[in-house]
Amino acid sequence: MKFKWDEFFVTGDPLILGAQVSIALSTIAIIFVLTYFKKWKWLWSEWITTVDHKKLGIMYIISAVIMLFRGGVDGLMMRAQLALPNNSFLDSNHYNEIFTTHGTIMIIFMAMPFLIGLINVVVPLQIGARDVAFPYLNNLSFWTFFVGAMLFNISFVIGGSPNAGWTSYMPLASNDMSPGPGENYYLLGLQIAGIGTLMTGINFMVTILKMRTKGMTLMRMPMFTWTTLITMVIIVFAFPVLTVALALLSFDRLFGAHFFTLEAGGMPMLWANLFWIWGHPEVYIVILPAFGIFSEIISSFARKQLFGYTAMVGSIIAISVLSFLVWTHHFFTMGNSASVNSFFSITTMAISIPTGVKIFNWLFTMYKGRISFTTPMLWALAFIPNFVIGGVTGVMLAMAAADYQYHNTYFLVSHFHYVLIAGTVFACFAGFIFWYPKMFGHKLNERIGKWFFWIFMIGFNICFFPQYFLGLQGMPRRIYTYGPNDGWTTLNFISTVGAFMMGVGFLILCYNIYYSFRYSTREISGDSWGVGRSLDWATSSAIPPHYNFAVLPEVKSKDAFHHMKEEKTELYPESKFKKIHMPSNSGRPFFMSVAFGIAGFGLVFEWYWMGVVGLIGVLLCMVLRSFEYDNGYYISVDEIKETERKISE
């Protein structure tokens, strides 16, 4: 790649200029606030170096909300461009860049970290653990994700964004058709963030299998913990495929290899297969934790034990197996034989069976329950019909012959948004509101929360339901404009109105966070909603102390905390207090991730010397870690008593 210094910063577009100015002003404002209030030491010692799973979860969620804003703005710009025929709001290249970054950010840098953030906050509490199995690795996982996300996101102001679509199909992603650093940003940003996700998968799989409290057998685990365990197993098997695929495509672009080009025996379809062998399990990586969140919320606010617990566990395991057997349905039209298409058509339809089982589990859980229509419960109730719409249209797409009509039309776009927004995004909002007191010590305002729910949910349906009909009328996806005689104007305009309603809903959520911080009553009890059934609500305060439990609880049944309340069990008798071992904070994961970022940035522009320097930094941090003998520290019984006394006051 012949790099030109006058092309280092992206110029010539007022939208990009506005973004550059806002980034500069925001950075200056953050530095000023931290300096003025003397918070640099606090930021370093309490957050950047923390190994506390709860704080890392909050950092994941904050990052995900920022990415939701960035990806949402991309989506609104796309809808603004398509609102009217022959619109010139965006040119074709800018639209392709936004289309690419929107999909990548929402899947990789918003949905996954949001769910991983909730997992970090909740799962160790649900299994009665003090922290995760590998706290140091947990910090490293976050910072590699964050650095990968930042590397990807600076592309739109430095060098130029990727524009080959979020799937980066070859040969479109080759140097010939996508010159410049944009596609390199995609490959290296995802690679670095993917390393962090793989480490998270290993960490939480070990945590759940090895660190459950006394009496918590696998079949007594909360459903959110079960879905997390299965999700982590999928991550461990799926993400190495993505890692290898990204590495091979990087070799094609950076070093002239031919893994995915027809020259020298390469095969473009190899990329499509590798991408979707990871890509479809990825769908279940972001949907299974959502199922767990809805299970916790529905069971809690229906005040009933989850119906069909064993069937629920079996269906989750079945989905995890089938998720690796359906990837070819993403390219039924690309020349596979009839027998291959038939096999993957059958497996795709089969995966709807265990998914359907869970729908009935939730419905029967609510049957004859004393339901409280809180904001989290409203999101859970909205999820069921909207997700079913997405699922039914998914079965339609699973029919290989019919897919020749639906493929690459807006019918498909509507389908996966009904699955991913109604499934994953609704769950992120529901879980965020449900466990908000566990993170910040107070609830979000219910009245404002319900305004957010209704505006966003109605806007979602106004935006995406018309797209089914646009697809049936032949509107292809990924086009940046259309003619007035195509007959798509009215439905596209309606869809755009719905998209901006969703944007208004997001702003209401942000206002709710501010309003609740100022005016909400601070929670005293660890059971903030009064309907808690699992151990995450059994803590002695709304925000758990850093050691989580003064005495590790003993579990005797499913819904352990619910039964403890019924039996009036004393949770934390002082006679059982013992000194608690906790891990020490460390700044090395941060520096190692920065080194990853330096290496990635250098390789984006093919400055190999910078790439080597960055990788040497990574190796140096690993060597220093191997000579580290810090085994953590102990919290004395007196300190535990003092902490618990302050909590109870």
UniProtKB/Swiss-Prot annotation:
Sequence ranges on the Extracellular membrane side: 1-13, 77-104, 161-187, 250-273, 327-342, 398-415, 473-492, 604-606
Topological category with respect to the lipid bilayer: Multi-pass membrane protein
Associated pathway: Energy metabolism; oxidative phosphorylation
Predominant location category: membrane
Enzyme class: oxidoreductase
Presence of keyword Iron: yes
Cofactor: Cu cation; ferriheme a
Catalytic activity: 2 a quinol + O2 = 2 a quinone + 2 H2O
InterPro entries: Cyt_c_oxase-like_su1_dom, Cyt_c_oxase-like_su1_sf, Cyt_C_Oxase_1, Cyt_c_Oxase_su1_BS, QoxB
Record EC number: 1.10.3.-
Keywords associated with the record: Cell membrane, Copper, Electron transport, Heme, Hydrogen ion transport, Ion transport, Iron, Membrane, Metal-binding, Oxidoreductase, Respiratory chain, Transmembrane, Transmembrane helix, Transport
Compartments where located: Cell membrane
GO annotation (BP), single: electron transport coupled proton transport
Residues reported to bind Fe(II)-heme a: H102, H417
Binding site for heme a3: H415
Residue spans, topological domain Cytoplasmic: 35-55, 126-139, 209-228, 295-305, 364-376, 437-451, 514-585, 625-649
Molecular functions (GO terms): copper ion binding; cytochrome-c oxidase activity; heme binding; oxidoreductase activity, acting on diphenols and related substances as donors, oxygen as acceptor
Binding residue positions for Cu cation: H280, Y284, H329, H330
Parts of the chain that traverse the membrane: 14-34, 56-76, 105-125, 140-160, 188-208, 229-249, 274-294, 306-326, 343-363, 377-397, 416-436, 452-472, 493-513, 586-603, 607-624
Database matches in Gene3D superfamilies: 1.10.287.70, Cytochrome c oxidase-like, subunit I domain
Cofactor binding annotation: Binds a copper B center. Heme A3.
Cross-link (1'-histidyl-3'-tyrosine (His-Tyr)): H280-Y284
Family: Belongs to the heme-copper respiratory oxidase family.
Protein name per the record: Quinol oxidase subunit 1
Organismal lineage: Bacteria, Bacillati, Bacillota, Bacilli, Bacillales
